[in-house]
């Protein structure tokens, strides 16, 4: 009789503990994250070989829908590298924050969007999601932004692809 009573207590407790442990794992399911963006660069302070570049623009992406973004980037013009951060804001105000490292240089590829002119750069940014708000609170993931940017017209455009934890899963 005592064994039956113990199993009546231990089995539900074990199920409860397993369910609690499964919730954080479910919140970490990665889903595809991709889209397109366009914007305008604005050169800031230049302390050779580093130039500060601020970018603002818009785009459309999975889980974000239509969004706007602001980017701050410190570019080493000699090495063709950079580091920075982006604040991505969905139409409803939910947001994602990322940090990135970048590399880039001249390219012979055709322009990816109008307004780049004849001379532009190829830029690859590797992003890590560092936080978010709303349905992106607690978000994690990483993705790559591949874009082109004109040092003459200051236009930029490109695409991104990678993964993000399932939006809203942490709630």
Question: Each predicted region: which residue ranges?
Answer:
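Cleavable N-terminal signal peptides
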Residues: 14-15, 25
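Sec/Tat signal peptide C-region and signal peptidase I cleavage site
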Residues: 21-27
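Beta-strand-enriched cores of mature, soluble protein domains
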Residues: 27-171
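Bacterial N-terminal signal peptides that target proteins for export
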Residues: 2-13
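Accessible peptide chain termini
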Residues: 1-2, 143
């Amino acid at each position: 009789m005592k064994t039956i009573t113990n199993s009546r207590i231990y089995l539900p407790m074990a199920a409860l503990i397993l369910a609690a442990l499964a919730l954080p794992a479910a919140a970490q399911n990665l889903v595809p994250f991709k889209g397109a963006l366009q914007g305008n660069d604005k050169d800031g302070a230049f302390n050779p070989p580093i130039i500060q570049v601020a970018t603002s623009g818009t785009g459309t992406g999975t889980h974000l829908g239509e969004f706007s973004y602001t980017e701050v980037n410190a570019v080493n013009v000699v090495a063709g590298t950079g580091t920075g951060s982006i604040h991505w804001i969905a139409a409803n105000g939910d947001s994602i924050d990322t940090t990135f490292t970048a590399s880039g240089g001249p390219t012979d590829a055709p322009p990816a969007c109008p307004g780049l002119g004849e001379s532009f750069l190829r830029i690859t940014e590797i992003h890590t999601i560092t936080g978010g708000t709303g349905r992106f609170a607690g978000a994690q993931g990483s993705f790559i932004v591949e874009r082109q940017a004109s040092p003459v017209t200051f236009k930029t455009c490109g695409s991104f692809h990678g993964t993000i934890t399932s939006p809203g899963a942490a709630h």
